[in-house]
């Protein structure tokens, strides 16, 4: 009871239980080092606040007893609470490090990057998934872009259920004729290191087949920007921002589509300093290397951005609850629109100037991929322009909203 308890791990998801009959806080590991999901009852929540690495089990017992109106909490119950958190990988302890190292080694040894969200975000059965995607694509009229100047599209990475109209609007612009291209997928790395970019050689395996990585291009990029790149980044194993794009690409183009998946870490330094992201030498070198690749490969590449926009409400640390397309979200839509105008104009600096004040209070998690794409296009396709195909907002829970949309990009003026 007198030894210090390891601190609660950073980076775990802590959210209110959505089930009225089971109140409390839910703990979940987005890195999937542990598969456990724990419910912390209301009376035990005060213990989480003092799991700082210096508190003892006696300190926890005292805090819990005080929070429960002076009613003594048994020491064996406190011990069970601590052991459960530790054994399930939620404390910064040796048990967690073993779990983490084991998962990293599993990913390193695996021949492919296997679907993480099949069976939850979308069907795990190939026939059922194909049927679902065909239905999704019928939600919007078929509008394949016949322009040879089409450079790429941007789509959400929110749940396909919540973002289906935007996904369909983006991927309806694609056709099997693009199958010979390599699809450069710039996805948000929700869990990656700041100012870093995650690469992998592993094929993305989904129920529809394997999307092989263009390894030669990946190696060239990694070699030319070694300080900026994390090879075989474990974040690929758990990240959804690229996985969802691969599934839609496989339906829109071909199941064995060839990809160059790039996870873009948060550009925190630019938000902290107010200086453009490529003021950071790692970011600048990566963008230069990507632009060099794009210059050489030219029309052999097609660009896909897996990006969401604003994150507003209680889930994201805001004091008020919000509802999609109501109240405060009208102002958010107007501010999103101003940023999208700069994106479509190819105005990288104008986009950044709207994002960085107040360290991006709209919390656009697509900021990194969008900035990297715009800056790369400035190098190789300075006349590139975009068009907004659809804008949406969705209540990810009863109190919180995510905004997102679909865009297309052209080499030059947008066709009428």
Question: What are the residue ranges of the model-derived segments?
Answer:
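A short, structural micro-pattern
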Residues: 19-21, 198, 256, 401-403
